[in-house]
Swiss-Prot record:
Protein name: Homeotic protein ultrabithorax
Pfam families the UniProt entry points to: Homeodomain
Highest taxon in the source lineage: Eukaryota
Bias-annotated ranges (Low complexity): 138-150
Protein function: Sequence-specific transcription factor which is part of a developmental regulatory system that provides cells with specific positional identities on the anterior-posterior axis. Binds the consensus region 5'-TTAAT[GT][GA]-3'. This homeotic protein controls development of the cells in the posterior thoracic and first abdominal segments. It activates the synthesis of the decapentaplegic (DPP) growth factor.
Known tissue expression: In the embryo, expression is seen in the epidermis, somatic and visceral mesoderm, and the peripheral and central nervous system.
Disulfide bond annotation, renumbered to this chain: none
Motif, Antp-type hexapeptide: chain positions: 239-244
Gene Ontology MF terms: cis-regulatory region sequence-specific DNA binding; DNA binding; DNA-binding transcription factor activity, RNA polymerase II-specific; protein domain specific binding; RNA polymerase II cis-regulatory region sequence-specific DNA binding; sequence-specific DNA binding; transcription coregulator binding
CDD domains linked to this entry: homeodomain
Native species: Drosophila melanogaster
DNA-binding region(s) from the entry: 295-354
Gene behind this protein: Ubx
Organism phylogeny: Eukaryota, Metazoa, Ecdysozoa, Arthropoda, Hexapoda
Amino acid sequence: MNSYFEQASGFYGHPHQATGMAMGSGGHHDQTASAAAAAYRGFPLSLGMSPYANHHLQRTTQDSPYDASITAACNKIYGDGAGAYKQDCLNIKADAVNGYKDIWNTGGSNGGGGGGGGGGGGGAGGTGGAGNANGGNAANANGQNNPAGGMPVRPSACTPDSRVGGYLDTSGGSPVSHRGGSAGGNVSVSGGNGNAGGVQSGVGVAGAGTAWNANCTISGAAAQTAAASSLHQASNHTFYPWMAIAGECPEDPTKSKIRSDLTQYGGISTDMGKRYSESLAGSLLPDWLGTNGLRRRGRQTYTRYQTLELEKEFHTNHYLTRRRRIEMAHALCLTERQIKIWFQNRRMKLKKEIQAIKELNEQEKQAQAQKAAAAAAAAAAVQGGHLDQ
């Protein structure tokens, strides 16, 4: 049974899973290798736990709201609880890899998977016997007696790379079975019945192991290259839904990429985002939130007492020292930055007032000069009239 209840690094890390994992994985690897493989094979990783923890140690009981649901699920599946669960773990001990049952490489009794899982694993009896009982028995016997037979043991050094490469390869097949596809194909063709399949499996193991390591190395390098290129592209062309709502669009010549990203979020387009932001500009959005989605800080309001004290201090001195600014901040329940900005604004206001006063004085002077000139002209005219008479 392939479920999360059999994995030591399962969904919640229940203590029953740790015992089942230790029993299921003891037939193929030591505890260190099984722990390293389980760290990469466990999906999803344990919540709040390190993936490199020692899985062979007995875990302490965790007080979690999920314990009751896990216990109920175990009882529902296995009936009497721990007894049936341990028996199930013993039954899958022979055909499990790293504590996990291989659902792809089941080529023993059913006679399946020529160039795929069965052949790549070296169990050629199932494929050569055309699905009969003799072929299945030959494959199982050869896998148990021959330490190199049966299902191939994935090298721990290749586990992360080959697993990533397997999932990156979209040509078909499973991440486990398609690694030894070519060697498995040769073994399945040569086996005509159960006995021939059992004899030929010894030759298939060596070829499968060589092809396994070669494919693992090649796929690992290809996986790293593909992963690096995908991360580079993702960092350069990252698009978020709020960009469309805000009317912003990254400069990318490939418009189809942007359209595909927008389509997966309900068909949002840049034009729709602009119309949406314009329609909400004057109706639903508050004053402190702009049309482009950026927060705009509101004006700081001061009480009458704070304004009076600040005006009194400004009347005494237009510039404050650091010590005096700290004292006023504590006295008025304001921050130093607020007081500093208030004094800056007050000095600018005073400067504008002084400039306005100067302009008014100049205008008054000009008006007085014009009046004086007009009066002098009138007096000169009157004086000239008297002289003419």
